[in-house]
């Protein structure tokens, strides 16, 4: 009997929620709303391209020698995965370090507003999700860092929208504690007028307030503020189209 790859069980990840008490399927949900400058030409070609690059751990510096010939562990940076999404006249670059896996990327555009969402996909939707221990989950919400860099794009190629529905993380959106998740934020004000950005991390299978955190960032009318975004009303998720 042939079992589709998406349904095959493996020891470290599963296509349905784990029954184990101490295991968690951690997910991340990143929502961004960009208002472009008034004079920016309207471009509603969303999902023009998505590229993913993982920068592996940095090689130890050969010039640095320790006394016992072993390389120092502290010099090795954890790998960062970058997603570059081009669409709607923007190139949005997101970097994720020590975070849950991104499995779904979607965009929508309406006039001068471009929205994007990057998220994990909860088990049971045909994508595997690793189950990690409670301790690993606590470390993840402390260590996960998301960086963002938004540039202007003059890409003219057509949208490459996928026909499947946008899959989501299923993380609950109740009020949770803040954690400093957002790292560097860079915007090109030539085309970006306002920016609202929300990140949420949590257990995708069961509500666990201890494992749910959020962070937010706003850049409105030239001034930045952190932690102030209400992600539930930030964008209309029903209008998003799948880019991957």
UniProtKB/Swiss-Prot annotation:
Keyword Hydrolase part of the UniProt annotation: no
Regions that span the bilayer: none
Keywords for this protein: Early protein, Host cytoplasm
GO cellular component, one term: host cell cytoplasm
Compositional bias segments (type: Polar residues): 37-53
Annotated SUPFAM superfamilies: Soluble secreted chemokine inhibitor, VCCI
The keyword Transmembrane helix is annotated on this UniProt entry: no
Induction cue: Expressed in the early phase of the viral replicative cycle.
Subcellular location: Host cytoplasm
Compositional bias per record (Acidic residues), positions renumbered to this chain: 54-77
Pfam family, one: Orthopox_35kD
Stretches the record annotates as Disordered: 1-79
Similarity field: Belongs to the orthopoxvirus OPG001 family.
Role, per record: The protein is truncated in this vaccinal strain and presumably inactive, because the lack of signal peptide prevents the protein of being secreted. In the wild-type viruses inhibits host immune defense by binding to host chemokines. Binds host CC chemokines (beta chemokines) such as RANTES with high affinity, but not CXC or C chemokines (alpha and gamma chemokines).
Protein name (record): Inactive chemokine-binding protein
Species whose genome carries this gene: Vaccinia virus (strain Western Reserve) (VACV)
Source lineage: Viruses, Varidnaviria, Bamfordvirae, Nucleocytoviricota, Pokkesviricetes
């Amino acid at each position: 009997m042939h079992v589709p790859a998406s349904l095959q069980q493996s020891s470290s990840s599963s296509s349905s929620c784990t029954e184990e008490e101490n295991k968690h399927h951690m997910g991340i949900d990143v929502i961004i709303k960009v208002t472009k400058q008034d004079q920016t030409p309207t471009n509603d070609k969303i999902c023009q391209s998505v590229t993913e690059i993982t920068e592996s751990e940095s090689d130890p510096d050969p010039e640095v020698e320790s006394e016992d010939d072993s390389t120092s562990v502290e010099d090795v940076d954890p790998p960062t995965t970058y997603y570059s999404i081009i669409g709607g006249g923007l190139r949005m670059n997101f970097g994720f370090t020590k975070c849950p896996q991104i499995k779904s990327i979607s965009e929508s555009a309406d006039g001068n507003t471009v929205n994007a969402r990057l998220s994990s996909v909860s088990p049971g939707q045909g994508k595997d999700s690793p189950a990690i221990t409670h301790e690993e989950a606590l470390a993840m919400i402390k260590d996960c860092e998301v960086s963002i860099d938004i540039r202007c794009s003059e890409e003219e190629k057509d949208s490459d929208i996928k026909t499947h529905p946008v899959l989501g993380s299923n993380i609950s959106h109740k009020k949770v504690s803040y954690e400093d998740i957002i790292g560097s934020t860079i915007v090109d004000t030539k085309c970006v007028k306002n920016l609202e950005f929300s990140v949420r991390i949590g257990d995708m299978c069961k509500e666990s307030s201890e494992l749910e955190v959020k962070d937010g960032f706003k850049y409105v009318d030239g001034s930045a503020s952190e932690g102030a975004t209400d992600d539930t009303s930030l964008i209309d998720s029903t209008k998003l189209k799948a880019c991957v």
